[in-house]
Regions:
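Short alpha-helical segments enriched in small residues
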Residues: 1-165
Length: 165
């Protein structure tokens, strides 16, 4: 996806949120705030983007958005339970309507047989108590994995929560 197409996707998501009078928050690890960046590239995004949390370290995940240390120790940062807690914690801290959380292994190092480089977990939650998780394994270099994760997060929010509601 080109930068222009990514901007168009951000605009579509933003318009849908604005039409609902809803706000979005993000909790990002491996993407390092890339989702928040492409969202805030859109003029007027303050109407629907509340805030973004870049929680790269486990300590940041625990301190900023309340991910339990026991969850991190038991499952590791790149896991379904962690992205669930990240999304719920971001919603709570930001008092937003929708949350996206992302934690993954962008590479080139850090992968294992169980969690290879390119593994990314996503969490999506709403203030209405809805939520889903997704796991993807992207290929390519570090920047490519991070870009693909950013695109996937926005597309999934759109398709699962905003498109037909």
């Amino acid at each position: 996806m080109t930068d222009h197409e990514l901007m168009q996707l951000s605009e579509v998501v933003g318009l849908a949120l604005k039409q609902r009078g809803a706000t979005l928050t993000t909790a990002e690890s491996c993407t390092g705030g890339w989702v928040a960046k492409v969202i805030t590239d859109i003029a007027g995004s303050s109407a629907w983007f509340e805030r973004g949390f870049v929680t790269y370290s486990n300590e940041a995940k625990a301190q900023m958005i309340g991910v339990r240390e026991s969850t991190l120790e038991q499952h590791g940062a790149v896991s379904e339970p962690v992205v669930i807690e990240m999304a719920i914690g971001a919603l709570k801290e930001a008092r937003a309507d929708y949350a996206i959380s992302i934690s993954g292994i962008a590479g080139p190092d850090g992968g294992s047989d169980v969690k290879p480089v390119g593994t990314v977990w996503f969490g999506f939650a709403t203030s209405r108590g809805e939520g889903i998780t997704r796991r993807e394994c992207f290929s390519g270099d570090r920047e490519s994995v991070r870009r693909q994760a950013t695109v996937y997060a926005l597309k999934t929010l759109w398709q699962q929560f905003l498109q037909n509601t």
